[in-house]
Amino acid sequence: MDLIQQQIAHEEALVGAAQNDARIALEKAIAQGSIDRIPRARIMLMRMLPIVTEAIFAHQEAKAAGPAAKLRHLLRIIDAQDLAVMALRAGLSMLINYPTITATKYYTHMGKMLCREIEVRLAFKVNQPYYDRTLDYLKTSRTRSVRHIQKTMDALLDAVLPEEARIDLPDGDYLRLGKFIGDPLIQCGLFEPNRFTGRGGTSVHLEPSPEAREFLQDPSAAMTWGGPGRSVMLAPPRPWNDWCDGGYYSAKAQKHHVLVRRTKHQTKRARQAQLRHLGQDKMPKVYEAVNVLQSVAYEINRDVYEIIERVFNSGGGVLGIPQRTYPDKPEFPLGDEWAKENASEQELEAFNRWKRSVHRWYTGEREHTAKLREFAALYRVVREHHGKAVYFPMHVDSRGRMYYWGTPNPQGSDIAKACLRFHDKRVLGKRGLYWLKVHVANSLGCDKVYFDDRAAWVDERWDDFQRALAEGPENYPGLFPEAESPLCAIAGLLELRAAYASGNPEGYRSGFIVHMDATCSGLQHYSAILRDEIGGAYVNLLPPGLAKADIYSRVLGLVNESLERDRAPGAEGEARGYALLWDKAGLSRSLTKKPCMTLVYGTTFKGVVDHCLDYLDESGVEIPEGVPSYRLGSYMATLILDAIRETVPSAVFAMEWLQRLAKALPDASKDLHWITPLGMQVFQSYPKTEEVRVRLRAEAVEYVTLYEAKDELDPMRNANGIAPNFVHGLDSSHLGLTALACAAEDIPIQAIHDSMGTYASDVDRMHVHIREQFIAMYSGPCVLVELAKQLGVEATPPRRGSLNLEAVRDSWAFFC
């Protein structure tokens, strides 16, 4: 069997695993009682069934009024125990397919499922012979495809039921109906609700309860998760010839893995318009770049994997390797009888602090679950494909941002990156050894000084590193801080040790990948566009000397100056009190790093406030009674954002200019369409949404909000979205152009958005191309002016400074 035949068989097996082993095995175990196949599911079902049945029966018998009362007659059509089994089967299926699911999607699915069951039962009464023939067909075909069964039943309903007998409800009513059978699954402990607040507002997500998480961590369950995107390719991906023709080989895999994904921030109209512009003839360089990037062969670094496996099997929790179990959620500090409306200010502060800690816990728990899934996939790949060349097909989002499919993913966690290296090997040479050392230093946080100093830093600690490798890196937490990338550092040290052990380190053949990262790439783009010498210096567009410019420290310095002014003895007002409180926290650059990094990608003022309050909590600072936490956070957020504005004024100006440009469109209902420097056809059209609010009594949440997207543009969201989407397109363009330039010299690139990696021996040439392509992108007409022309808006060109772009060529810290 050749590689392509192996890959097709591999894809078909993975698709089968995803559709059958994960979903049908669980549903069949519930329906048939196959306890030998999934014993934990059997235990959960048998324990929960009486509780769910009783709760649904209570809903059926209730007389309460309200928006959902008109739907209760539908609930009463089916026996409570039948509904309970149906709901539990669906709920357990969701556990397999989704690590988290929005409450709106969950309830709406339950409501539609209930209505479908009612319709099929009615069809049975209307025409039992037709139903029996349909059932015989399904049995004869021995289908295990849920989708196939659904399509067959659709045909039955179309043939048997008249249109007036079909159930057709608004989404809001499906949601309300679904609550009747969905809430009992939360009450019995299958799911837990979690409330998230983001830029789009507040939403409720349902996640597996601790018992369900334990079920998911069972290796027999984890190893059944599949689909081509959950593994690797064994043959080079098919070159993309069209947006739906490339990547995977089998028809099923191709259908669900197209080149350009639709985003939820697009109207249907915008998506259809974009599809008409996604041909290879309209954006040839995009196709060329993704084909180059996905043609690179990788392999698993078995030595690194064995360290990860050993640490995980001993309990995990060090070197960034997940614990086998996740810590319990923070306990509610105020007692069961506490009521928010009767709370004191001190109690409200304790409540808000607890909410922030729970939010951090859920974030950590999701990351923990993701790492467990990543480790399970890594285990499978090592077991089945160790020593083989493996590949990762590429795709892009609607802005042109490039991603790999597959697990372990080159853009994944420290675990994934450390375990991947190029399959083909190249001689290290003197410079390759040098860059390996720089990589180790970068991975351990020694990344502010010049490259020579980083390499020397590793040499000075070589004996300590050798001892740690011999005795187990997990026993040396001081050498490998988890805040950095300890596993990538260990991978580099293992490669160095192997090179030295060969007796000819410069002649050692290596597939190790060394990455170079941008310094706040979004700010680099805007500073270059407007030729901003001030901002450009702080993001290393200009040569910085022997230590790279640190914008986070610069912003922190300005914040400290403001604090010193506000806390001076003669200062008055609440600002002085806030400044004194923040002084107690002991400010560090971690406070300003995240806002600097996320400003150009659409962070909100509230997001910065929440970040500041999290920093206070983690610093152990108690907010005194009577001090409103949000105002305290707002005070610091304002100082940080003002400091960023002073440090990189061009970036803030460019973002505001872009927003004004979007608002100046002559037709506010028109999609925004522009072309990135790489040639990506971007169609931005944020849809208006209609909001339906439903109370969730079982979760103790006041409302869950259902958003129904309309095929109508929201001008305000469109204006707010243009700046982050525009800079994402610039990031991906720089990456794609650099990958093409490197490919011309046979230098493969591993792409991580604003970070690029290659062979240690080729890092010097990669540095050259990174800089040359950046200079070339901005040496022509101003991209902001070109954007205005593409949008058909007459706009005053923004003022530009005197930054000489050629200086980027000599800035060692531009990517470092």
Swiss-Prot record:
Family to which this protein belongs: Belongs to the phage and mitochondrial RNA polymerase family.
EC number, UniProt record: 2.7.7.6
Source species of the chain: Pseudomonas phage phiKMV
Record's protein name: DNA-directed RNA polymerase
Catalytic activity annotation: RNA(n) + a ribonucleoside 5'-triphosphate = RNA(n+1) + diphosphate
Example of a GO MF term: DNA-directed RNA polymerase activity
One GO CC term on file: DNA-directed RNA polymerase complex
Keywords tagged on the record: DNA-directed RNA polymerase, Nucleotidyltransferase, Transcription, Transferase, Viral transcription
Functional note: DNA-dependent RNA polymerase that catalyzes the transcription of viral genes.
UniProt keyword annotation of Transport present: no
InterPro entries from the UniProt entry: DNA-dir_Rpol_C_phage-type, DNA-dir_Rpol_phage-type, DNA/RNA_pol_sf, RNA_POL_N_sf, RPOL_N
BP term (GO), one: DNA-templated transcription
SMART domains per record: RPOL_N
